[in-house]
Amino acid sequence: MNIRKFIPSLALMLIFFAFANLVLSDANDKAKKPAGKGSPSTLQTPGSSSGASLHAVGPNQGGLSQGLSGKDSADKMPLETQLAIEEIKSLSNMLDKKTTVNRNLIISTAVTNMIMLIILSGIVGFKVKKTKNADDDKGDKDKDKDNTDEGDEGDDS
């Protein structure tokens, strides 16, 4: 194996692998970043309220029994219902982020496997080619040796 050609190609593959890993794992880093000082977090903790939009609605304060439409009654849901909806939304957002991270991990694993297979197939192919060339060279030397022996026998007669 020609080490002078193999080491630069291996170094190039490792640089490519590091670059692909950096690009594909960027989403994982973004998912773990905390919110900045100036911007509030978009995900609220379960049980927290966002201010004036959440207020307790008593049994006599609204709903379809007072002639309000379905849309108006949805705006005046009980506090427990609104908190449950907020919790479901936050869990949904968290699952979406985890799905994105998992998708990127699967893609990066697939890319890593392809790179390793390319490296291994290149090494195996190089060794097979080298042994085949060595066998061909050995066979050519044997043929040349046989031809010179036959040529010597033909000259004697």
UniProtKB/Swiss-Prot annotation:
Applied uses, from the record: Antibodies against Pfs16 partially reduce parasite transmission during the mosquito vector stage resulting in a significant reduction in the number of oocysts.
Principal location listed in the UniProt entry: membrane
Assigned keywords, A-Z: Membrane, Signal, Transmembrane, Transmembrane helix, Vacuole
Record's bilayer topology term: Single-pass type I membrane protein
Cysteine pairings via disulfide bonds: none
Extracellular side: 26-105
Protein name stated in the entry: Parasitophorous vacuole membrane protein S16
